[in-house]
Amino acid sequence: MKRRLVLPLAWAVMALALAAPAAAAPTREVVVLTSFPKELFEAYKQAFEEKYPGIKMVVKQQQTNQAVTYLRETRAKPEADIMWASAVDAFQTLKGDGVLDKIALSKETLARMPARIGSFPLHDPDGHYWGFAVSGYGLMWNTRYLALHKLPAPKEWTDLTDPRYHGHLSISAPSRSGTTHLTVEVILQAYGWERGWALLMQMGGNMGAIAERSFGVPEAVISGQLGIGVVIDFFGLSAIASGQPIDFAYPTLTAVVPASVAVIKNGPNGENARAFVQYLLSDEGQLKLFSPEIGRLPVVPALYARAPKGYPNPFTMKLGGVEFDDKLSSSRRNVVNALFDHIITFRHAELRTAWGAIYAAEARTGKVRAQGKNLDDGSRDLAEARRLATTVPLDGMRAADKAFNDAFKDKPEVKSRLETEWDTTAKTNYGKAIDRADQSARLR
């Protein structure tokens, strides 16, 4: 009796199993860590998943400096497969930390791409990261805003020190944006340490706002909250392609460097990560850079024949002017970012007020000179006010010293002491600059 009951039950179970839908095969993944805006990575996510339907692209969006820290902290058991960002010096840092895997590309892929853009390598010569797009750094502006406020269009970094731009500019903090860090480094390497910081400090004094993320700058300019933004080129190019009232210019002294992609060593999905890199460098992946929502520059010169009309070609244009040293930029990255924060970002209100006082005093000086009056004492006060508002509290030689940078990175007590010194010096200097500017006015 029991035997007769068991057999029908077994057949019933088998029938149910056959009738049930087959369990879906586990979806493979590639985990991508990126600082790029949603418009860019969503477009690539959709295209990549269509090309590789068995692989799900999981995106973790992080600011570049945070991503570098995250990859260092998880290197024993990586959770990400891909690092994908604009800041080439961040890749240099990660390579030095042993975080990146070495990958080889096919001969066909390599043959389509030059080794350099100008004098700068497009790829790591050892194969730890690969340029997938070219980026330049410059200025975007809202044409309607400038017309409304009767402001000229800027062309050079030095134009941003014009008193007429006071309160009309925007930049993001380099500690929160890898692309802004590169822009700051471009200026420091173009003009030298002291002169470069003097330029940055006066630019900072003209800023209407310092954004927390790089995306905040184009948003403010496109919306008309502010007139001019210091940006990576694709923010300007994509806005123009989308029909916004925006224009963009590369300053004479800028750098054209690659935005890169790398595979994380011992990441959970190494094979899928390599497929993602190959897709980015394929014709399909490269042509997607021309999309209006992306607006970036491919690394395959032949594809510019298929670019939208008027699209910049960095391989034929004379761009650059700065022999960018990514190793120098990488070595002092932490120091430069912290210094910018403590003398510009965190003291922006005082810095902006100081430059407002200086500009007002200089305007009064011009009127007094026109009357033929003696200005010696007032001129000395104004010169001192400018000196106080443009003096960086760190020597350039020290900033480039390896031991100094290592101590700043590895010893919290050293970092804390220096940051306190910089902050105190900035606050004191800007207060004195305001006093000297006001004093010069009282002598009229």
Model-derived regions, located:
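A ligand-binding cleft/hinge motif common to bilobed small-molecule-binding domains
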Residues: 89-93, 222, 226-245
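A bilobed periplasmic-binding-protein/Venus flytrap-type ligand-binding module shared by bacterial periplasmic
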Residues: 140-145, 257-270, 288-289
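Periplasmic-binding protein-like
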Residues: 168-172, 199-204, 210, 241-267, 279-301, 305
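C-terminal non-catalytic accessory extensions
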Residues: 359-444
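Extracytoplasmic ligand-binding site segments that recognize negatively charged/polar headgroups
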Residues: 35-42, 79-222
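Early extracytoplasmic/lumenal segment of secretory-pathway proteins
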Residues: 25-92
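Paired acidic/hydrophobic, glycine-rich loop segments that form the ligand-binding mouth/hinge
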Residues: 78-85, 210, 227-232, 247-249
